[in-house]
């Protein structure tokens, strides 16, 4: 019986490469679980694998939103779960790859989301609109310090949602999250990490490569498609900083530095989140035998070799 495999962990550790290798070995299909890779056209700054590098393996939950649309954890959960179940029904192995923390938990733990109240939400949205993300972050820090430490300080929408839940339930935002138990579908969760110094160097190289590969031009093109109006997309690491550069808030070198610092901070949050989950089986992304080690950890789930002819998606 096939079970899904999840490959999670911090940014730039090598999750995508391992996910591809496992999908090849397990006759699998990839389900993306990186929130910013949901967006069409956000390719360079999210390190999205080009189609030519996907080895003919079908990928799901990539390029499903326009930059003007708002990403929703609940919507992702519903759509990605349908993808996982369809892959299983085809007799293939879902390989879930990415590092967006709440998206991972929502999918694998079947998170039931609290109700919403338009009046309460509108109050916090007014604060966001009139005083900005710093004021919303301060309010969240006062109401729920743990949530404020977990949610990206520039993610106004998610902070508004957290404040709404705290006000409606009288409990911390995390209290609405599922308890950690057996993952949905019996998913086996692999985590990929690297030595901190090595990962910092990889992030620096990747950030430089993004700018050298045309991130500024990509953002300019997305502005023409409505990026500035996008509630979620415009706040993505790198994209927000290039927008600030285009608005003459600072120069290009400062945009690069802010992108690098933002990525490193995000990595620390990812590490803290995933390391708390005892179900994750950790792997060293620098291990030359990474794929072999991962397959050994998977045990019986990796016993059936790939046999189905692939079609490029």
UniProtKB/Swiss-Prot annotation:
It holds the Pfam family IPPT. InterPro entries: Dimethylallyltransferase, IPT, P-loop_NTPase. GO terms for biological process: tRNA modification. It catalyses: adenosine(37) in tRNA + dimethylallyl diphosphate = N(6)-dimethylallyladenosine(37) in tRNA + diphosphate. Substrate binds at residues 11-16. Keywords: ATP-binding, Magnesium, Nucleotide-binding, Transferase, tRNA processing. ATP binds at residues 9-16. The record marks 100, 121 as: Interaction with substrate tRNA. One of its GO terms (molecular function) is tRNA dimethylallyltransferase activity. Gene3D superfamilies: 1.10.20.140, P-loop containing nucleotide triphosphate hydrolases (3.40.50.300). Transmembrane segments: none annotated. Its EC number is 2.5.1.75. It comes from the Bacteria. HAMAP family: IPP_trans. Catalyzes the transfer of a dimethylallyl group onto the adenine at position 37 in tRNAs that read codons beginning with uridine, leading to the formation of N6-(dimethylallyl)adenosine (i(6)A). Belongs to the IPP transferase family. PANTHER family: TRNA DIMETHYLALLYLTRANSFERASE. Monomer. This is tRNA dimethylallyltransferase. It comes from Nocardia farcinica (strain IFM 10152). The lineage of its organism: Bacteria, Bacillati, Actinomycetota, Actinomycetes, Mycobacteriales.
